[in-house]
Amino acid sequence: MNLNRQYVNRFIDDAIQYGDYEREDNYYLQNLILEITKAESIDETKNNNGLVNPTSNEIAQFWIQQMLNNGLLEDVVYQKEIVETKLLDLITPKPSTINREFWKRYESHPEKATGYFYQICKRNHYVKEDAIAKNIHYYTETEYGDLEITINLSKPEKDAKEIAKAREAKQSSYPANALCMENEGFVGSVTQAARRNHRIVRLNLNHQPWGFQFSPYAYFPEHSIVLSEAHEPMKIEKQTFSNLLQFVQKFPHYFAGSNADLPIVGGSILSHNHYQTGRHTFPMDHAPEMKQFKMEQFPDVQAAILKWPMSVIRLKGEDLDEMTEAADHIFETWKSYTDEKLDIRAYSQDGTRHHTVTPIARFNQTTSEYELDLVLRDNQTSTQYPDGIFHPHNDVHHIKKENIGLIEVMGTAILPGRLKKELLEVERYVLGDINAEPGSHKKWADKMKEKYNFNNENAKNIIHQEVGRIFKRVLEDSGVFKQSTEGQKGFEKFIQTL
């Protein structure tokens, strides 16, 4: 296999412009490219193979396809990603260079620093904009405001061959998980993602070392992760509230939140302490305050219950220390709070703790105040609700049965990719196609048929909006104090204990 001279030159130019190389590194880079692609030499002919003014990523994808065509690479996701990240690492500065440049730009303005880093991560295809663009995205109007609905199609699914290889592969404990620092520059394997082009910015939160990185398959603009350098499990504590507030003080254009630290109500990774951040206005940000209240011991902190399907207390203030203390007071009170009448129990008889919070911090540019939202969570199960009392109930599992994590708590649904095909079947079914197979959605589809007069013009939109209403139900199921009179009285009773 020979590589096209124009593409090699273009790639080398990008490595010199964007990476850590100079013009004298020309032949060195050329030989690295030949080694990574397993090519024998370079074709000096002028044929550009149809790519006009290609990006480095487009050239990398072209070479990967060439390798597949020549039997030099197996057509499985992890092997293609290893080659891709090795190539695109060449156009990426070293971690030390990025860290130096990031903090130099930060002195001028925090947005310049994150903007610089984000451009690098998009250019080297660590942030996969092309994949993210495949996601289905729309809004549904509800009594709580517009909920944001996404069907996640960006992450490539492993095929049977790759799953079998992963099962047979020797399990490695390095890197320990997908969120530890050791992933920076890691070559990848059948069981662990290729991260050769991955970079992490180092930062301190409360004098402890943390890392800041962007998320490859983002759920919203500049979706990023702040991860502890220490290998420690997810933990909600006083330090968490302080860290989140300190992060938004450093980066006021980003929000910062943490998943809860208990199963069922937590995120998918509980083994490594991390927060999620980014530049996005979530539906919950607009939630109106239903009832304001004061806690005497924290005179400078305003508090309010939000009109939201989940049970949220919003704290507002300018003194970060006092806000941290107020948040910790609410958290500690909630951890031991029980209301049998509402099925709310802090501990099982065997001493298992059930209560925690999902905290979200932001700096409100309009009021120049810090805000800290505490979403009350309870992870009990029961005979009636074996998956969780305050978790999506069985009748909505056909749309969503996974944990309700931080992003969804804020009103942005991350629905499974399977729904794209399944909803097309539902659409065919409601339009009267006798060969349609609505599967687990049949009961729901029949209800919609009774409610609406479907035609080719309105079917897709009606189905999408009904999915949005099911997501509203999912959030209501997950709320501990329900929107009923009894539920809201229960919420006020809890507030009085503060």
From Swiss-Prot:
Protein's GO biological process: galactose metabolic process
Which EC class is this protein assigned?
transferase
Q: Where in the cell is it found?
A: Cytoplasm
Which pathway does it operate in?
Carbohydrate metabolism; galactose metabolism
Which Gene Ontology terms of cellular component type are present? Answer: cytoplasm
What keywords were assigned to this record? Carbohydrate metabolism, Cytoplasm, Galactose metabolism, Nucleotidyltransferase, Transferase
- EC no. given is 2.7.7.12
Catalytic activity, reaction form? alpha-D-galactose 1-phosphate + UDP-alpha-D-glucose = alpha-D-glucose 1-phosphate + UDP-alpha-D-galactose
Presence of the UniProt keyword Membrane in the record: no
Statement: the UniProt record of this protein carries the keyword Cytoplasm: yes
Q: Which GO terms describe its molecular function?
A: UDP-glucose:hexose-1-phosphate uridylyltransferase activity
Q: Taxonomically, which superkingdom?
A: Bacteria
Q: Which family is this sequence assigned to? A: Belongs to the galactose-1-phosphate uridylyltransferase type 2 family.
Q: Which HAMAP family match?
A: GalP_UDP_trans
PANTHER family on file: DUF4922 DOMAIN-CONTAINING PROTEIN, GALACTOSE-1-PHOSPHATE URIDYLYLTRANSFERASE
Q: What's this protein's name?
A: Galactose-1-phosphate uridylyltransferase
Q: Which gene encodes it?
A: galT
